[in-house]
Swiss-Prot record:
2-gamma repeats lie at residues 495-528. It is an enzyme of class 3 (hydrolase). This is Abrin-a. 1-gamma repeats lie at residues 369-401. Keywords: Disulfide bond, Glycoprotein, Hydrolase, Lectin, Plant defense, Protein synthesis inhibitor, Pyrrolidone carboxylic acid, Repeat, Toxin. GO terms for molecular function: galactose binding; rRNA N-glycosylase activity; toxin activity. 1-alpha repeats lie at residues 283-325. The B chain is composed of two domains, each domain consists of 3 homologous subdomains (alpha, beta, gamma). It comes from Abrus precatorius (Indian licorice).
Amino acid sequence: QDRPIKFSTEGATSQSYKQFIEALRERLRGGLIHDIPVLPDPTTLQERNRYITVELSNSDTESIEVGIDVTNAYVVAYRAGTQSYFLRDAPSSASDYLFTGTDQHSLPFYGTYGDLERWAHQSRQQIPLGLQALTHGISFFRSGGNDNEEKARTLIVIIQMVAEAARFRYISNRVRVSIQTGTAFQPDAAMISLENNWDNLSRGVQESVQDTFPNQVTLTNIRNEPVIVDSLSHPTVAVLALMLFVCNPPNANQSPLLIRSIVEKSKICSSRYEPTVRIGGRDGMCVDVYDNGYHNGNRIIMWKCKDRLEENQLWTLKSDKTIRSNGKCLTTYGYAPGSYVMIYDCTSAVAEATYWEIWDNGTIINPKSALVLSAESSSMGGTLTVQTNEYLMRQGWRTGNNTSPFVTSISGYSDLCMQAQGSNVWMADCDSNKKEQQWALYTDGSIRSVQNTNNCLTSKDHKQGSTILLMGCSNGWASQRWVFKNDGSIYSLYDDMVMDVKGSDPSLKQIILWPYTGKPNQIWLTLF
């Protein structure tokens, strides 16, 4: 077994905790799927490499070890001195590889929140987290106390501050801020919904077809409102730091080094899903068959998304790469920039004119012409065309039945939040009640101030060091289209640069465009 990953509460800082979580993520990571880190595929893992340990200490003389199953990042056991304790649902091999040479005991409860909460006689929302809770838990485990209620409560603290924090940037950030400010916190509705949907989000990403989840995942924001996630390009996906391994994408290039027998055992994602969804784009409008007319050659337009799901705004993403409404195909009239897009009978249309690929970044491209779906007109009813791909905001799309903007605050360097001030934007102390800190993230990739959704975050020029300001969205420019990535960056596709707090100095009151360095002044998080 590798050496344990260590964290001490003594002299702990938000920085020492951040380093601990990063080391843990690194140890748990198996590979990347859709550019998002994923736990190892269990079929490629030998049983003896299945477990890792984390050492949590209050001082040189007071420490415990926690055993984690790398296939699911679950806490399966802990050791205090010469005694170790295994959860009831720990895999049978856990006791063969973890804490051998100690007296091994079985705990009376499972590692699920439902069971732990029953034994603790408290829900997760009632149990405070933070440095003090962790320090207390380490001391209690180390003392060998026999109170099962307290054991369950302590495990709820450790699981969330260690395992859940490794899975989600949102959760590690909550813990980090609590260490920074020296205050305890109780999990909010967003945090609980992430914990409860980790497997659903992981499955959605890995089984996604044409940038779209087979089934929508319903998260909750801090105001207890539903947030529906059904696309890889939904900004909430960027809070995932590690996914559960579900399956390999059907077309994944299998490494030739993997032994054939292992590859055959390994689970490949089904490609049978053909989701039927809306396609949201420019200004949050929907791709719409004009006037509900399904005769060949009728144009496809942008129209406001209807309150109810209606046929002429519903599209089935077929495995043959066609996109169909009412059984007919989304078809480009030609292969030259400016060709209009129409509805057409799939069997009589030129096949290549009906094929589309939806990229993870929200681009919809016709492979034959290499042109992309574009909403050139900002007015409702404007006809869709294919155009040269320039990653313009008017060429950004997000599939899913919920195409409404995701409203959130955005935290960044030094745990400050992005704040609108007239046409400027800078960093200020976070206050979730401040309208100037609320941002609406649209289907077209734009980031808009909720105070005036006609204003978009825009980089002033296409060059390194350009200031980011609020400018009219009606331009639909490339400098107004952003991607929230899992490395924490807010990325401009056209410029291949990211949002950066200038000079790591918030007092300069400037956010600029800069090449990605991965430094803290380029790391952002949607706070739900």
